[in-house]
């Protein structure tokens, strides 16, 4: 759902894709590495946004950091709110549990 308080620009030069880690990337790490690289190659910003706390196996996501993807641990805060507080507008979400994008469980 588009936030009506911000202008809709379907033609912005660089859109951001927020990708979940658990049950998305973990289901096929090698396949997702290729997909994420393709997104970057065709001009998207790609970030990893996990509902995890930073203390829950943070090293498990190091391979993504080493590939140049920013990783955000929301600590069970709604992902959309969390990244927007950091000044990041995610245009496309890829998540197995879409409620975590809009709802907190903290």
Regions found by a protein language model. Name each.
Residues 1-80:
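Alpha-helical substrate-recognition element adjacent to the catalytic core
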Residues 4, 98-106:
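Asp-based, Mg2+/Mn2+-dependent phosphohydrolase catalytic module
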Residues 80-99:
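Conserved Lys-Pro-Asp/Glu-containing loop-to-beta segment of HAD-superfamily phosphomonoesterases
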């Amino acid at each position: 759902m588009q936030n009506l308080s911000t202008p809709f620009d379907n033609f912005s030069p660089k859109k951001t894709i927020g990708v979940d880690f658990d049950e998305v990337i973990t289901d096929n790490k090698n396949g997702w590495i290729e997909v994420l690289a393709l997104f970057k190659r065709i001009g998207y910003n790609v970030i990893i946004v996990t509902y995890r706390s930073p203390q829950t196996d943070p090293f498990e996501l190091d391979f993504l950091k080493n590939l140049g993807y920013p990783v955000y641990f929301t600590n069970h805060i709604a992902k959309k709110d969390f990244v927007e507080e950091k000044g990041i507008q995610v245009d496309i979400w890829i998540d197995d549990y879409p409620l975590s994008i809009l709802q907190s469980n903290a």
